[in-house]
């Protein structure tokens, strides 16, 4: 809806005006939504700063004046098609939603995936959208970052010129209680017969400290050691030595409130046995302890490179503007960007081992197994659903 036009900008003109001024699509002009924030961004020559500010201010202040049922219905179908394409009709496409549902209780903001269910998308009314926009897309709930080749006093004057007249929105309602126990209490098991899957795959998710927790850097480094790159423990064991998987990796989501998810994934070879793959993955995770200084140093160096490399760009994901916005959004500190590397440097082997012993345990995990439909009969009879 944010690109469908506002009072002074027609449908599609946001992109066309920025592209005519030197911006490009993709990482230069886009919008994203994840569990904890929605962000919109553009990157273009510095002499076009006022154009970008005018466009953003116009849709923040006047989007509802151009919104109607036809636009809502159109965008509803766009999102439904995105769900079909990226989730429902993709091999293993439902893995995130299934692990979220297992690792976070019903009623928690992280219990559901970001894109929403088909039922929720169908039920969203024009009034729902208008009320949501009035509540959350207002100056008192927004972070505006201008970065790059700018004159700071002049940039601030332009911001005041275009945004000062937009009134505050209503008080943003506080989040429901997001606190959860450190441990989910028992192993959750889910087996999915997947008609799209070419091979079995096993996903093991753990509830871990959130990105706001002081242990968050240790979570990232633990995930790196176990599951990032060909030097990781999982790749070395499952792909290189045992040769039971074609890929093995880990993902840390960086969720902000209450808890986070650390997920390890192994994909088998076509025709291979899902039980053997699961057994091998769980065995490696059970041995996630006694990390070495070399492993810690390697993971820390990789994170340092990725972080510093991202800061070489002004826009895009992980660029300077993005990091400044993250700092204020999650920590109320735009200077947080200058603290990240120090936080990684302070993680010790004891921190990693303690975190693994506390969180990478059977009673704190959800095991999700995807079985290709043609292999299902031999397995489904013994499946225990949560």
Locate predicted features:
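Non-catalytic beta-strand/loop surface segments
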Residues: 9-48, 73, 86-141, 165-213, ...
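Short amphipathic alpha-helices in soluble, non-transmembrane regions
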Residues: 54-59, 157-163, 277-284
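Extended amphipathic alpha-helical segments enriched in small hydrophobics
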Residues: 261-293
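Short, conserved charged micro-motifs
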Residues: 49-51, 152-156, 214, 271-276
């Amino acid at each position: 809806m944010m690109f469908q036009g506002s009072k002074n900008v027609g449908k599609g003109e946001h992109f066309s005006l920025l592209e005519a001024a030197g911006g490009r699509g993709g990482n230069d002009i886009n919008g994203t939504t994840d569990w904890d924030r929605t962000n919109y961004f553009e990157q273009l020559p510095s002499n076009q700063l006022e154009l970008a500010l005018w466009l953003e201010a116009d849709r923040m202040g006047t989007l509802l004046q151009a919104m109607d049922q036809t636009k809502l219905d159109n965008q509803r179908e766009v999102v439904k098609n995105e769900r079909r394409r990226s989730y429902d009709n993709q091999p293993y496409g439902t893995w995130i939603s299934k692990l979220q549902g297992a690792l976070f209780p019903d009623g928690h903001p992280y219990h559901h995936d970001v894109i929403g269910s088909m039922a929720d998308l169908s039920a969203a009314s024009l009034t729902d959208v208008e009320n949501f926009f009035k509540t959350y897309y207002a100056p008192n709930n927004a972070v505006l970052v201008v970065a790059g080749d700018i004159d700071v006093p002049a940039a601030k004057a332009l911001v005041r010129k275009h945004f000062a007249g937009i009134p505050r929105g209503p008080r943003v309602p506080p989040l429901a209680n997001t606190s959860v126990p450190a441990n989910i209490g028992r192993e959750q098991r889910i087996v999915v017969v997947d008609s799209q899957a070419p091979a079995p795959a096993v996903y093991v998710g753990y509830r871990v400290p959130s990105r706001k927790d002081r242990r968050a850097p240790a979570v990232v480094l633990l995930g790196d050691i176990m599951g990032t790159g060909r030097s990781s423990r999982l790749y070395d064991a499952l792909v290189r030595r045992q040769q039971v998987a074609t890929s093995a990796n880990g993902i840390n989501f960086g969720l902000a409130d209450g808890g986070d998810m650390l997920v390890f994934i192994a994909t088998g070879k076509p025709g291979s046995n899902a039980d053997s793959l699961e057994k091998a993955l769980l065995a490696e995770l059970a041995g996630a302890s006694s990390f070495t200084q070399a492993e810690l140093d390697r993971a820390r160096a990789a994170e340092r490179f990725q972080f510093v490399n991202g800061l070489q760009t002004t826009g895009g994901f992980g660029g300077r503007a993005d990091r400044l916005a993250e700092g204020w959004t999650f920590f109320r500190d735009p200077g947080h960007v200058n603290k990240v590397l120090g936080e990684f440097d302070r993680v010790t082997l004891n921190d990693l081992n303690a975190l693994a012993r506390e969180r990478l345990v059977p009673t704190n995990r959800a095991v999700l197994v995807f079985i290709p439909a043609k292999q299902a009969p031999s397995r489904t009879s013994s499946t225990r659903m949560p």
